[in-house]
């Protein structure tokens, strides 16, 4: 209770913007588009972005398209004006975890050959405190894409799209993270050893309680000054490193009308080929320390490096939908598949990853349209997650990775919609 209080936030923003768009045909088969937008706000720097797009109708069946653009995202009202927000969550105390590992590698402590959380607890509730920052800059991105649209004349109703895209985003707004801050605290404490224990505080953003006298011996035996549990980690919003994403999207759309009804088919597939965040500043320092072997392999670094396939960032997503309509009746069936990824915090000391497998769900609906007191009405019955697929097991709240999956199981709803 009251472990994650959120205070009221107030703020205001006055924005002046200007937008200009020009569509300029070059030939009968080639057209271009040029757009420019400028925004000026009173609480962060102004920004000017633009877009250039070109399309070429090679023949009645094939069109090529490409675009390049810049974009920005202003810091939101909360990120600029947050007076203070606290979030509590269970986290690893990597200082304690490493102390356990060091003692166990040395044969234990005080006659105990296996030091665990029952001796000194390495996993408990830790608060994160954050405040807004009026020094935040807007996120900026450069985007490009190239693709094609294919509508074969010999198959009426069929359309295939294929696009390759890339995004480079700078000044991404985010948090350094509790985990990373505690890892930095661990580095500083093991580097300091047993020197000046009365005055040494480690990472000043990791605020700890006074050491427990009954546990002090574990830390001195491992070669560091005794510590208490983490009271809170100060983690304010900041503009972080450059983020790069790239991938390929494909779409297949097919509609056909028959005496048995109108049928539709849609497939959308997305393959992410790159998702990285450059290590800079504190991130770069931690990465260099890990590469030097000063941070063990079983201690994860969050939020930078190669993020593809990590912690909910699956690299494939497939959506399939089939629909039918005849008169007042209609039906649909759809499938959603999300690819596998690994949970970084469960990586073993030898580098073995815990892989969370892909998840596929199927939905189905039946609908009937009619008139109700002269108004258009529709009654729909739907079954979500037809096969009662459960979310794959993960070391998270409720046993699954909520950032990527839902675990509702099979569920139903009946919907009546009336248009007046």
Language-model regions, residue ranges each:
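C-terminal beta-signal and adjacent terminal beta-strands/loops
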Residues: 170, 273-276, 280, 334-346, ...
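Transmembrane beta-strands of outer-membrane beta-barrel pores
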Residues: 16, 36-42, 68-74, 81-83, ...
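Outer-membrane beta-barrel transmembrane domain signature of Gram-negative proteins
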Residues: 1-31, 279-313, 317-319
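Outer-membrane beta-barrel signature, preferentially recognizing the C-terminal barrel domain
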Residues: 11, 74-160, 233-247, 258, ...
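Surface-exposed extracellular loop regions of Gram-negative outer-membrane beta-barrel proteins
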Residues: 9-57, 141-145, 334-336
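Transmembrane beta-strands of outer-membrane beta-barrel proteins
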Residues: 32-34, 50, 64-66, 146, ...
